[in-house]
Amino acid sequence: MVACAALLTVDVGVARAADPSPAVVSIPAGPFIAGSDGAERDYAYRIDAAAYGSPVTREQKWYDGERTRGTAETGAYAITVTLITNHQYAAFVTATGHPAPDVDRATWESYGLIHPYARTRRYAWAGGRPPRGREAHPVVLVSQADALAYAAWLTRLTARTWRLPDELEWEKAARGTDGRFFPWGNEFDRHRLNSHDAGPFDTTPVGRYRSGASPFGLHDAAGQVFEWTITADGDGRAIVKGGSWDDKGCGVCRPAARHSRPVGLKHILIGFRLVRE
């Protein structure tokens, strides 16, 4: 952890009011420990069972498909310190006329999710503006294509290349190089993240859980909302990472945890952050 923390570099972009560049941290090229082993997965299943009162995630084998623990390599890149916020996304919507985050009832109900449609209304935009009081919350109800469109706009505006991270880039930034179970260490601590264990059962302003930062300085890499990656997982699906405010346990909030969602899904539990090349 000390070695990773020493490498932390924060780049807030050009210091001018009109610059839309999100703050980033620099991640050096090189190896890191990715994936999980049996001991980590067993720990995840045990903390889930304690939270849910049953071994449901073990029975459904939630974590059995994780990458086998081992060394992986990435190049150097920078990644946004926080998830992209409603305020940041609003500049894109205003400038381009891109559809604002929302989902209609029929589409939502076609997803077959457990959350009722009424719950989506607190996150839906009106008149091209984010919900009042949620400007600093992560933007949600965005598909992977929406995230890519925001990245393309930011690229044009800043003359720097912005994109979604791939799964390994995201995982390295979220856990550091030493293979820890969570961004902060190997023990789950419900006070270090926004999850259903101790959170408000809702999104919060980004960066609130500072004690849950990763060794590289990422905030909300565990909990808050899942995050789109560019890594495909079969036809029309992409890997999402990070866990959410709706999860408890929170084995799914580990950086090694992974599952995929349809790329067109607009979910109240999925947002994104970006890599800058």
PLM region spans:
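Short, structured beta-strand segments at or near domain termini in extracellular proteins/domains
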Residues: 268-277
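Boundary at the C-terminal end of the N-terminal hydrophobic targeting segment
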Residues: 15-17
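Functional-site microenvironments in short loops/helix caps that host divalent-cation chemistry
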Residues: 26-27, 33, 39-52, 56-60, ...
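Bacterial N-terminal signal peptides
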Residues: 1-10
